[in-house]
Amino acid sequence: MKRQKRDQTERAFVKGYQAGIEGRSKSLCPHESGLARQQWLNGWRESRMDQWDGYSRLAQVQKITNLHPMSMSG
């Protein structure tokens, strides 16, 4: 079966969310500019807001897995 390539902006969002879960600084964004950087920062911000709203680390992992089912597999 042919694998479908993931959308780069979706991947950037997920990676940003994961960075937020791990408590990393937003200044560590690997993207210099453009839509990928914006999506990475959006993911990072959403993760931080979820932490402030009381989500546990496990709940955050579950949330991102539900939003993007293939994101945590690699």
Swiss-Prot record:
Disulfide bonds: none
InterPro entries per the UniProt record, alphabetical: Ribosome_modulation_factor, RMF_sf
Alphabetic keyword roster: Cytoplasm, Translation regulation
Keyword field contains Cytoplasm: yes
Predominant location category: cytoplasm
GO cellular component: cytoplasm
Example GO BP: regulation of translation
Subcellular location(s) of the protein: Cytoplasm
Pfam families: RMF
Its job: During stationary phase, converts 70S ribosomes to an inactive dimeric form (100S ribosomes).
NCBIfam families: PRK14563.1, Rmf_CrpP_fam
Family the entry assigns: Belongs to the ribosome modulation factor family.
Protein name in UniProt: Ribosome modulation factor
